[in-house]
Amino acid sequence: MNTARKAFGRQCLRAASVLAIVALATPGALAADLVRVGKASATTFAFAPIDIGKEKGIWAKYNLDVESIGFGGDARLQQAMVADSIDFSLGSGPGMGFLAKGVPAVTVAAMANEPLAMGLSVGKNSPIKSYDDLKGATVSVSTGGSLTFWLVREFSRQRGWGPAGIKTVSLGVNPAQVAALKAGNVQGIVTSSSIGYMLEKNGDGRVLVEFGDHVKDFHTHVIFATKKFVTTHPDRVKRFLAGWIEVIDFMAKNREETIKLVTLVSQLSEDIQTREYDKAMPMLSRDLRFRPKALDVLARSLVELEILPTAPDMKTLYTEEFLPVRN
């Protein structure tokens, strides 16, 4: 009897060992690889793929555990990369200039093209009724050297007023800018157009300038990765970008569900989010690749923002080596 029990025990032990090996070899049984992602703004539509990918299980499909945190503009985002507190950052095209100044990162994807989702909004009692009324006015931006800062200067330049024809003040996150507008401390705010749509709905203001009508060749948003991360975890970079492309594909094919999911991030009403989806979805890149004309405009913007004294060789600031191979 004892011999039979011992034999049975050994069989059970062997079976358990086999099951353990099978479990370890099964995708999903292993702990997902952590990636830390910073957003220049926590609620921006173009950055919502992080949250949608998590909700739909797309990051899990690529064995990634994606954590994200919002920052108040590009400058703070770049500081986080220097401090090695994030692996990826979702920022603006002009933010590429900080790489030439020593931020230890590389641009790995161009995720949004012309700034279809960016606007300049004015208050309900504002004396500013037309483009020409903006000359000499003071508007808020997130930070100096940011996308919002450049858009104002570029619009002013196109109007023939020079880059400083519209005055700017840096106020950080969107709530602070909206509060300043309502208090009359600024004559306009440069944010995502959805903030302007919200002001319109509440009777507090309106969108005056849609920057996508004035800036055509551009990379509004890009994805950065720290040099340390691309060196130590190149496979995670590839998986993250492949997952991002899949999320964008989902968003394009599932309009109604995407709108509902984005409202959880933006905290905007569904009607406003619908308006933003229809406006902004076309600017989101399906292949994440860089466009020569857009890079030329970015190079010029870095000089105009006084981030760099001369236009850089943009090829030194980005790479496409981690993007999926074209079919």
Functional labels for PLM-detected ranges:
Residues 302-327:
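Conserved C-terminal helix/tail region of periplasmic/extracytoplasmic solute-binding proteins
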Residues 47, 78, 117, 131, ...:
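Extracytoplasmic/secreted envelope proteins and their assembly/folding machinery
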Residues 94, 126, 175-264:
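Pocket-lining segment of extracytoplasmic ligand-binding domains
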Residues 231-309:
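Secondary-structure end/capping motifs
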Residues 2-17:
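Bacterial N-terminal signal peptides that target proteins for export
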Residues 33-162, 168-180, 187-193, 208-211, ...:
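Short, glycine-/small- and polar/acidic-enriched structural segments
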Residues 26-31:
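Sec/Tat signal peptide C-region and signal peptidase I cleavage site
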